[in-house]
From Swiss-Prot:
MF terms in GO: serine-type endopeptidase inhibitor activity
SUPFAM superfamilies reported in the protein's UniProt record: Serpins (SSF56574)
Name assigned to this protein: Uncharacterized serpin-like protein PAE0049
Coiled-coil parts of chain: none
SMART domains referenced in this protein's UniProt entry, alphabetically: SERPIN
Sorted UniProt keywords: Protease inhibitor, Serine protease inhibitor
Record site feature (Reactive bond), residues: V328, C329
Similarity section: Belongs to the serpin family.
Tree of life domain: Archaea
Record's GO cellular component terms: extracellular space
Length: 371
């Protein structure tokens, strides 16, 4: 992936991106807390940044409120070192997109690609899916599903992709065999022992109510946070960005050993309903994207795919989001951490707090694929 232009950090206020990231996770997670899940709010945010650049009036204010965008659509975050991102806008060849919108896409760092949805819909969608698959190293396939209604009326698809691969710091974990994981039975566990005098300690704490550990990676400020509450569903229900930020920013350096399972989490599907519940309504109905094109458009659907795999070497994570537009006229300290029960995980920048991936694990064993 090519680097995006130099951009300003996300404003991590409760009203900004951080609030969106946690609320988006909660909206999707509420119905599937009985299975593993990972999402990338950051990928969704970046895809909608391209939509925000073309929005006007009440639609613009709606997106601004939900996602925490600033006044200037070109002022966006650049990903942390080690996190690769790419943006593309797939546009109908003969549709009247405004030159100023194309300029905004360039300043955001998005590549405009022209396809013919009307005359060769299948080839256009195949090209979009191939691009997303390539940018995510083959981890996100068929982003726009094959059963998505075929039709000539698609006019634009805005796509963001994200990829991360990190090796554990200060050392790789070791496999330690099977351990019992609450609610799921035996699972393959890995351990990191830092009990020697010359070893650094990790940030974290352990108690019967809440166990938290920060797992850093080499050559990046991104870290994986494992957050194991007494009861995961209750914890997720009450979770806020402010609470999450407080938990991960006040950890002492006292963890000398970590045991946790190998785990994998995935997601692929539409997130339109979750976004509607968060307040994105006009964009899906009486939309005003008059800064985007000379003809009226609305968002028909939003497809999201995410993947995260953790093993003894580190973490591989990828995500992609596609926002599909159609014309309105066609609308239809000596602490040991043992992670042995359902937990929340967050892949985030340790300094800025930017959340790249967030999810939970209730069964670490099914379908595990080593990196």
């Amino acid at each position: 992936m090519r680097p995006l232009p130099s951009q300003l950090p996300i404003p991590l206020s409760p009203e900004g991106y951080g609030r969106f990231a946690v609320e988006f996770y909660k909206r999707v997670a509420v119905g599937i807390l009985g299975e593993n899940l990972v999402l990338s709010p950051y990928s969704v945010y970046k895809a909608f940044a391209m939509a925000y650049a073309g929005a006007s009036g009440a639609t613009r204010e709606e997106l601004k409120a939900v996602f925490g965008f600033g006044e200037d659509p070109c002022v966006l975050p650049a990903a942390s070192r080690g996190v690769e991102e790419a943006l593309s806008a797939w546009l109908q060849t003969d549709f009247p997109f405004k030159p100023n919108y194309l300029n905004k896409l360039r300043c955001i760092g998005a590549e405009a690609k022209y396809v013919d949805f009307e005359r060769d819909y299948k080839s256009a969608i195949a090209a979009i899916n191939k691009w997303a698959e390539e940018k995510t190293r083959g981890l996100i396939k068929d982003l726009v599903p094959a059963d998505y209604p075929e039709g000539w009326d698609v006019r634009a698809v805005l796509v963001s992709a994200l990829y991360f691969k990190g090796n554990w710091w200060p050392d790789r974990f070791q496999r330690v065999g099977k351990r019992e994981f609450k609610g799921a039975g035996p699972a393959d566990f890995i351990a990191l022992d830092l009990s020697s005098c010359g070893d650094p300690s990790l940030r974290g704490r352990a108690s019967s109510d809440l166990t938290v550990v920060e797992l850093p990676f080499n050559n990046t400020e991104v870290a994986l946070y494992i957050i194991m509450p007494r009861d995961l569903p209750s914890f997720v229900k009450e979770l806020t960005y402010e609470k999450l930020r407080e938990i991960i920013s006040t950890l002492p350096d006292q963890v000398i050993r970590v045991e946790m399972p190998l785990f994998k989490a995935e997601f692929k599907g539409s997130v339109k309903q979750a976004l509607r519940e968060m307040g994105v309504v006009r964009a899906f109905e009486t939309a005003d994207f008059t800064e985007m094109a000379y003809r009226r458009l609305y968002i028909d659907d939003v497809f999201h795919g995410a993947y995260l795999n953790a093993d003894e070497n580190g973490v591989v994570a990828a995500a992609a989001t596609a926002v599909v537009f159609k014309p309105v006229c066609a609308k239809g300290g000596g602490v040991e951490v043992v992670v042995d029960k359902p937990f929340l995980f967050v892949l985030a920048d340790r300094t800025s707090g930017v959340i790249y991936f967030i999810g939970h694990v209730v069964n670490p064993s099914p379908g595990f694929t080593p990196t």
